[in-house]
Structure formats: structure tokens, C-alpha cells
């Protein structure tokens, strides 16, 4: 989704991550059809996950389970991340796939810390909070996620400002709610 939005805005990017099965093939095809660059690692087993959002009063979500990421695949990802250069922007988005450590976002930000790579993190809960010590350039909690972090209800702009400010105090350079 990030690469599609950037492409629509005329910004060149490369979609990077893991794909598997017919869903992974379709993801690659759709991105390339829209002119997006891809550098996915294709896994030999499993199927890329599909997330379904149902428009209803309760906003039901159905999140399928994706493929298991092997240590070998993780090392391949890290090698690709090592190719990033000063001034590049890395977006880490979503939940952690099966097989990766719960600290993977922290590990990646730590690995890139000295290289002046701008990082954007779109994640929830501890996955988001645990990267703050690495001073990501931008984090993007929605107002529900922001409230969950601080165990409060965010129901007006004043609370958004207060609690987004608290995330900045904890290390985020910019917070987009």
C-alpha cells in the first residue's frame, strides 16, 4: 500500500518484504502493473496473508496468517537493508510475520541507527513503543492506537496533541495521528 500511494504521488520507491504463493505472485503483479519497483523475497512455502476489512458498525477485521519466515529469509532481508544509503527512507508497517522475533523492528532500527536513514513506523502497541528509543523519523498511530498506548480514550484534538507529544518525549521525532 505504501508503494502504491507513493507511486500515485510520483515518488519512486521499492516495495521490499516477503511474498509467498499465489497471493504473493498477485501482489507483485499488481505493484509492477502500477509501475512500482519490487524487491520481494519469494518464500518457497505458504501464502502471503490477506486482510479483509468489513464495513460494519463494529469495523470487523479478518486477518489471515501469513507464511513462516525462515532465518535464511531474514538474513536475506537484512542484506537488502544493508544496501540502504544515507537519506533513504524505510517504512516498517504492520504486524510481525510468524518466524520473526517480536523485536524485529527494534533490531532493524538499531542496525540502521548510524547510517542517517529516515525510518517510518506504522505499527501498534509494544511493537510501536519499543522502537521509540531509536528515534524514528515518523510514527503513525491512529487515534484508537494512541489511546491504547496510554490507556485513555482519545476523543478530541487536545488529547491527540497531548498524547502525540508524549510519544515525541519518548523518542518519536514526528507523530502523525
Q: What does each of the following model-derived ranges do?
A:
Residues 43, 53-86:
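Conserved phosphate-binding/catalytic loop of the ribokinase/pfkB sugar-kinase fold
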Residues 67-70, 96-100, 127-129, 148:
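Short, small-residue-enriched loops and turns at beta-alpha junctions
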Residues 99-107:
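Active-site core of PLP-dependent enzymes with the aminotransferase class I/II
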Residues 14-16, 39, 91, 120, ...:
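A structural signal for isolated positions on well-ordered beta-strands in alpha/beta enzyme cores
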Residues 84-89, 135:
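Short acidic/histidine-rich motifs immediately flanking catalytic phosphotransfer sites
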Residues 1-47:
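Substrate-binding N-lobe of the ribokinase-like
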Residues 106-119, 123-177:
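Conserved phosphate/ATP/ADP-binding segment of small-molecule kinases
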Residues 61-63, 87-94, 122, 140-145:
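Short beta-strands and strand-loop turn motifs
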